[in-house]
Structure formats: C-alpha cells, structure tokens
Design a protein with these regions (language model features):
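Short, solvent-exposed beta-strand edge segments and adjacent coil->beta transition regions
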Residues: 47, 212, 247, 305-309, ...
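Conserved PLP-enzyme active-site core in the AAT-like
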Residues: 7-13, 75-280, 285
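Conserved N-terminal alpha-helix of the aminotransferase class I/II PLP-enzyme fold
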Residues: 30, 35-84, 109-116
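Conserved small-domain helix->loop->beta segment predominantly found in fold-type I
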Residues: 269-328, 332-340, 354-360
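Glycine-rich beta-alpha junction loops
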Residues: 12-14, 27-33, 204, 256, ...
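Short, well-ordered beta-strand elements within core beta-sheets of diverse protein domains
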Residues: 249-259, 307-315, 370-374
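PLP-dependent enzyme catalytic core of the Aspartate aminotransferase-like
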Residues: 115, 124, 138, 318, ...
Length: 389
C-alpha cells in the first residue's frame, strides 16, 4: 500500500460496533480485563494491550501504528509535545558524566534543554558546526551518547549531511538523533540516510491548524536499551504520553497532510521568488533556492522538497518590527507549518531570553524575520508583504 493511501486507510483500525469510518476517541483511563492472568500479562508486557492510558491508549496507538507503517520504524511513541519527544529521547540516551554532540544552531528551547537542564544532571553538550565533519569527529569522544541535530535549523536554515554524520556516529556505536519536524516523515526516509531515532513536533504539520499539541519519537530499532528506557521510564515514570483527543485530531491531519504539504511547498516557492525582487529586502534565505549553499544537499536528502519555512533580512531590528506591525493578513504567531502564513522576529521572541552574546554565537540576527507559509492565495500574501514594507 502506498503512503498516500496508507495515511487514510490502514489495516490497524479494529472493528467498531457502529461501523465508524474514523478511529473513535477512547476517552478512558483504565481498562477491564477478562481475568487476572490477562491483566498480569498486559501489565508485565507479555501481551501488548492497553492497561492504563498513561502508557497506552487505543486511539493513540492507532496513530503510532499508522506512523510506524509509513516510516518503516520498529516502534513509534506518541508524546505530549514536540519538546516532550526531544527531552524524552535525549533523557533515554544520556547518563551522568556523559555528553551529547550537537549544533550551535537549533531551536531555543532545545538549546536550553541541552545547555541548562541536562547539565544539572551531570550531562554536558559539545556544540559545534555540524557542517564541518572534522569538528564533529573531534567533538565525539568515549563519553558521547549521541549526535543530535535539526535537519533544517530554526531559524538559521542550515542543513547538515545526515549520511556523513551517521557514519561518524556509527563508528562510535552511538545513534544519530534527528529532529525532522521541518520536512514531513511522509516526504523522505530519514532512516535510509542513517538516522537511528527521529523526533517530530506533530504540533506543526500533523496539526496543521494550530489546534493540538503533540510529538512523536520514531525508533528504528538499532538501540534496544533506548526503546526500553523510553517506554519504561519516560511513559511510566514521567507521564509524557499523548492524549487520545490529540491523537484523534492529529490522525485527521495526517490523512490530508500530503495535499496540504504539496500546496504549501508550491506557495513557498511562489512567495520566495516574488519577494526576491523587492529592494527593501536585503536577502531571502530558503534552502529551495538553487543559489542557496545547502540547495544540492537538501534536494538529495529530502526528495527535492525544501519545506515551508524561509527567512528575510531587513536593514535593522526597527525595520523588522515596523514590517511585522503593518502586516494585515500574515499572522504574528510563533507556530510553524500552519495552514496560515505566519511571521515572527526570532531574536526577540523564541530567542528573547538569550543574551546578545548567545544569540550572536547561534547566528540569530536582529535583522531576520522568519516566515512559515500557509495555504492562502499567495497573491494576497505578496500584496500584504508589499504594503507592510
């Protein structure tokens, strides 16, 4: 069965007494068992049946099984948010006295997790230029637990060579962990490029309309102890599982993701090319542009698709604020990959709590505006940009 069909019709939905076409929302916490033996088997993991909705729920499990089939993963775990997926994956890999190798370019909350939260538990992070493979090789040592990266960094839009990083990771018998939120897992196969574990904020593409918060960890089975820790410790002990209502909504989003994403990519390409000729804009950064330094690598890795996020640079922070304040159709909101086109000033929002020195080290500039492209008629959005400039 091909992916477009599998996203809608799957063999995993159990029969429903009423013939429901959509997977029902099982809004229940506990489950009744036929007898004590079955109950014991479920709780001890000898059979895979729902026992408590903090660790398994039929609606959530349906979404997990569908994504597992779409990706070819060994196991998919649905989490309460994208950050829950990232923190859950990393906590399941690290130990006191160990370290993570990652990029200087990443989402602000992920940076805080790696540089503020994990160090409190004795875990350090080596931040380096992941596009410089010699620097990565020097950063990895005997205490490194994993290499972690975003496949397209937010908001710097840097792309690293996944296959090359995977080779370095596997030489040291550690996993390559990738936040693949920027390109839907339906569009490219990260595992074929060497990624061992994917983390995804399903708040973005799967939600679409900014109506549900979730995340997933996609595990390709190369590190069995990771799978045990994620299930036994993150779900049982920390309670970061997705809720059934969110799973229901995100399953609906997954059904039409293919159509939405194709239109958003077309819209992004149209908008980017329309803006490149405007004199008020100093530069447009999009990995889908042929003159972008990461274009060839992105095309090779992501199946000739570059996502729906780009940035523009204006002359100053003040010019950025004036532009954002004058927008009428484009929304001032920090979400990504929404049905609506969104614009933010990253330096003063998602990196607003960072010092000037930290932002400079991460190449987060005061002159940059991040754009996430939606489903509107792009002629209207271009006109909105023109009047705001």
């Amino acid at each position: 069965m091909k992916k477009k069909t599998l996203a809608i019709d799957t063999p995993f939905q159990k029969s429903d007494a009423y013939g429901a076409l959509s997977m029902p929302v099982y809004h229940t916490l506990a489950y009744e068992f036929a007898d004590a033996d079955v109950m014991s088997d479920a709780f001890c993991g000898r059979i895979e049946e729902p026992d408590y909705s903090r660790v398994m729920n039929p609606t959530v499990n349906y979404l997990e099984l569908k994504i597992k089939a779409l990706t070819g993963a060994d196991r998919v775990t649905a989490m309460s948010s994208g950050m829950a997926a990232i923190s859950g994956a990393l906590i399941s890999l690290v130990e006191q006295g160990k370290n993570v190798v990652s990029s200087r370019h990443m989402f602000g909350n992920t940076y805080s997790l790696l540089t503020k939260t994990l160090p409190r538990f004795g875990v350090t992070t080596h931040l380096c230029d992941l596009t410089n493979l010699d620097e990565v090789r020097s950063a990895v040592d005997a205490d490194t637990c994993c290499i972690f990266l975003e496949i397209i960094t937010n908001p710097q839009l840097e792309v690293a060579d996944l296959a090359a990083l995977a080779e370095i990771a596997h030489e040291h018998n550690i996993p390559l962990v990738a936040d693949t939120t920027a390109i839907p897992f339906t569009e490219f196969n990260a595992h074929e490029l060497g990624v061992d574990i994917e983390v995804v904020s399903t708040t973005k593409y799967l939600s679409g309309g900014a109506t549900s918060l979730g995340g997933i960890v996609i595990d390709y089975g190369g590190f069995p102890e990771f799978a045990r820790r994620l299930h036994d410790e993150m779900l049982f002990n920390l309670g970061a599982y997705m809720t059934p209502h969110v799973a229901y909504m995100q399953n609906l989003g997954l059904e039409n993701l293919n159509a939405r994403y194709a239109m958003q990519v077309r819209n992004t390409e149209y908008l980017v090319n329309a803006l490149r000729g405007l004199e008020q804009i100093k530069s447009v950064n999009y990995v889908g542009l042929p003159d972008n330094p990461f274009y060839a690598l992105a095309q090779r890795q992501f199946g000739k698709t570059a996502g729906c996020m780009f940035t523009i640079d204006l002359e100053s922070k003040e010019a950025c604020f004036r532009f954002i304040n004058k927008l009428k159709l484009v929304r001032r909101a920090t979400n990504l990959f929404d049905n609506r086109t969104l614009a933010i000033h990253p330096a003063s929002t998602i990196f607003g709590s960072f010092t000037d020195e930290q932002r400079a080290a991460m190449d987060v500039l005061d002159t940059t505006i991040r754009i996430s492209v939606g489903l509107e008629d792009m002629d209207d959005i271009v006109e909105d940009f023109r009047q705001a400039l």
